[in-house]
């Protein structure tokens, strides 16, 4: 997978540069340059034209956020942020994603050399996946941002036409008590935010989001979605309950199960059971328990990500009578999870990211007769 990948490693710590470079080299990745700060990283990218950059967040002269912004403006290259596991770094890491970084990998605390060695396979796999991203082609954000409160338009008419206020032929209305389960991994945070920004509150969805992300970051991620969408979104806690117009983000290092469902409200349970598909939280866990528990309309959505997590969950949702959607290859940062889901034969619709919110709405509307 890593054969032929060329990387620049940027970190102000000589020790960390050496550890990261050795891990990548042992994994078959050619480290063409190392950089001590953001300015050196920008110069190295322009000179060497690598396939990927691993970028520390806090560096002298120019930090990782500024360097990422410069790289995207001057020589667009996939950037993987390497962030310390702190609340402060969570904030700046998400800022780097806003500037164009594809994803992030958390550097361990404690005995770094031992921990990095333990995580070496994950790091090599993630660097290789990020290197394959076409940063100029994926993740369009048209129709988001300042337009986040605007109801999207679909083939059945605008969402404002679906509120059931009219009875003329051709109008549609939302089904009662729909639930949406979203799963994503590499490259997913921006994609999830885009989908959520474009879901109208009138749809009254219950939304469960599983993004492969460590502790310390999922809370910040939930806050960002809450700010940018019309839905009330928070990080899941054990026993949390939500109804229409509300959402939960699975907490880092915890599986999120749907424990029970009654009268349009669902309750979640968090566990530290063994990782599923080598990850925790796992999309499959939430989708499978949702399919078993929820007896109202259910939609499963798989966005960009590496691996196969979510494929079995999509199968379970389809078998339970739910609707299923996967992101297309052209707009996925990494076409792993959506591909595996589609290969099950249980995906109803494959859509580009800009059409997914509309696609979700199409699954939860019905024509008024």
From Swiss-Prot:
PROSITE patterns listed in its UniProt record: CHEB, RESPONSE_REGULATORY
Active site: 185, 212, 309
Domain Response regulatory: start-end pairs: 6-122
Modified residues (4-aspartylphosphate): 56
Molecular function GO terms recorded: phosphorelay response regulator activity; protein-glutamate methylesterase activity; protein-glutamine glutaminase activity
Subcellular locations according to the entry: Cytoplasm
Top-level enzyme category: hydrolase
Any GO BP annotation: chemotaxis
The keyword Phosphoprotein belongs to this UniProt entry's keyword annotation: yes
Enzyme Commission number: 3.1.1.61, 3.5.1.44
Post-translational modification: Phosphorylated by CheA. Phosphorylation of the N-terminal regulatory domain activates the methylesterase activity.
Catalysed reaction, written as an equation: [protein]-L-glutamate 5-O-methyl ester + H2O = L-glutamyl-[protein] + methanol + H(+); L-glutaminyl-[protein] + H2O = L-glutamyl-[protein] + NH4(+)
Sorted UniProt keywords: Chemotaxis, Cytoplasm, Hydrolase, Phosphoprotein
CDD domains, A to Z: CheB_Rec (cd16432), REC_CheB-like (cd17541)
Region (Disordered): 136-178
Domain CheB-type methylesterase: residue ranges: 173-367
An example Gene Ontology CC term for this record: cytoplasm
Ranges of compositional bias, category Low complexity: 138-159
Signal peptide stretch: none
Function of the molecule: Involved in chemotaxis. Part of a chemotaxis signal transduction system that modulates chemotaxis in response to various stimuli. Catalyzes the demethylation of specific methylglutamate residues introduced into the chemoreceptors (methyl-accepting chemotaxis proteins or MCP) by CheR. Also mediates the irreversible deamidation of specific glutamine residues to glutamic acid.
Domain notes per entry: Contains a C-terminal catalytic domain, and an N-terminal region which modulates catalytic activity.
Family of this protein: Belongs to the CheB family.
Protein name as catalogued: Protein-glutamate methylesterase/protein-glutamine glutaminase
The organism of origin for this protein: Haloarcula marismortui (strain ATCC 43049 / DSM 3752 / JCM 8966 / VKM B-1809)
Gene expressing this chain: cheB
């Amino acid at each position: 997978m890593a054969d032929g990948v060329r990387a620049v490693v940027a970190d102000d710590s000589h020790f960390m540069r050496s550890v990261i470079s050795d891990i990548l080299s042992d994994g078959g990745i050619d480290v063409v340059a190392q950089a001590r700060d953001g300015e050196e990283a920008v110069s190295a990218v322009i000179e060497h034209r690598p396939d990927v950059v691993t970028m520390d967040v806090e560096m002298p002269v120019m930090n990782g956020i500024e360097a990422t912004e410069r790289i995207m403006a001057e020589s667009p290259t996939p950037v993987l942020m390497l962030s310390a596991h702190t609340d402060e770094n969570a904030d700046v890491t998400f800022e780097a994603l806003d500037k164009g970084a594809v994803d992030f990998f958390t550097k361990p605390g404690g005995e770094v050399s031992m921990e990095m060695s333990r995580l070496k396979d994950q790091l090599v796999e993630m660097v290789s996946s990020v290197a394959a991203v076409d940063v100029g082609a994926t993740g369009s954000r048209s129709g988001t941002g300042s337009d986040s409160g605007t109801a999207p338009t679909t083939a059945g008419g605008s969402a404002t036409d679906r509120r059931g206020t009219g009875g003329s032929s051709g109008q549609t209305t939302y089904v009662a008590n729909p639930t949406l389960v979203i799963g994503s991994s590499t490259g997913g945070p921006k994609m999830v935010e885009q989908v959520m920004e474009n879901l109208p509150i009138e749809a009254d969805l219950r939304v469960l989001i599983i993004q492969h992300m460590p502790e310390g970051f999922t809370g910040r991620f939930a806050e960002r979605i809450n700010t940018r969408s019309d839905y009330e979104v928070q990080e899941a806690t054990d026993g949390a309950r939500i109804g229409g117009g509300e959402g939960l983000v699975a907490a880092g290092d915890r599986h999120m199960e749907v424990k029970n469902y009654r009268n349009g409200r669902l309750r979640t349970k968090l566990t530290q059971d063994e990782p599923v598909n080598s990850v925790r939280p796992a999309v499959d866990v939430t989708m499978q328990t949702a399919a078993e528990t929820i007896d109202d309309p259910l939609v499963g959505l798989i966005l960009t990500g590496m691996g196969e997590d979510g494929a079995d969950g999509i199968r379970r949702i389809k078998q339970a009578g739910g609707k299923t959607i996967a992101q297309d290859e052209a707009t996925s940062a990494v076409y792993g999870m959506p591909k595996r889901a589609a290969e099950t034969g249980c995906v109803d619709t494959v859509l580009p990211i800009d059409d997914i919110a509309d696609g979700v709405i199409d699954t939860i509307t019905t024509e008024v007769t």
